[in-house]
Amino acid sequence: NSSYVTISHNRKYLYSITDFGVESYRILEDGSLSVINHASINGMRGCYLSTDYEDKFLFVAGYHDAKLTVLRVRENGEIGEITDEIYHKGLGSIAERNFKPHINCVKMTRDNRFLCAADLGMDHVVVYELNHMNGRLRQVDIIRSEQESAPRHLKFSKDGKLLYVVHELKNYIDVYTYSVDKEHRMPIFEKIQSISTLNDYHAGGSAASALNISEDFKYLC
């Protein structure tokens, strides 16, 4: 059974999480799909996947095992070998999540340099530098959120200069500026705003789950 799906940036291929790992499809002219291949992620079922902006690598977030998997993508859309596997470790702050790390979203910066991984169990976003030659990741930063806020989903602005992070349990969005230190080639994230996703008259029982931006890039949903 498929769950989360994503489309390559060249709009030619669709990738899906399945029971056995990930699967790739060719998008035909009539909109139908043709299976290309499938690949194991060597772990528990993923919850989110995305590609880099050159469509050379596929990233899979693991909620259940806190595993981040990187797989190579070939020019014909076929999923290749695993190039890196990283397990988030540590003691989380949320009792109902068993005090464990849970990776829920992975997304590249728009300049295609860094991969951001939202861990709602650890209340932070881990930032990795991607080696475009071998598909390996190197941790370079951590964006820390409020305790028990559960950062769940990420979105970058059209120009790539702003990062939006929605927090599931406390129902608010943090806004960060993004830039790169040219001397040290390191990412810089600075928080400029926190805004609630709830109205003043909200009665409770809400949990923020995802972010999207309107086609005109004027509204965050």
Model-derived features with residue positions:
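A short beta-strand motif characteristic of beta-propeller blades
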Residues: 1, 34-40, 90-96, 138-144, ...
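Blade-loop segments of beta-propeller domains
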Residues: 1-55
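Residue-level detector of Asp-centered blade-edge/turn motifs that repeat once per structural unit
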Residues: 7-11, 53-55, 110-111, 158-160, ...
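Asp-box/WD-like beta-propeller blade repeats and closely related beta-sheet repeat scaffolds
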Residues: 35-105
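Short loop/turn segments immediately following the C-termini of beta-strands
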Residues: 19, 63, 73, 120-121, ...
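Short loop/turn segments immediately following beta-strands, especially the blade-tip
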Residues: 25-32, 71-80, 129-136, 176-188
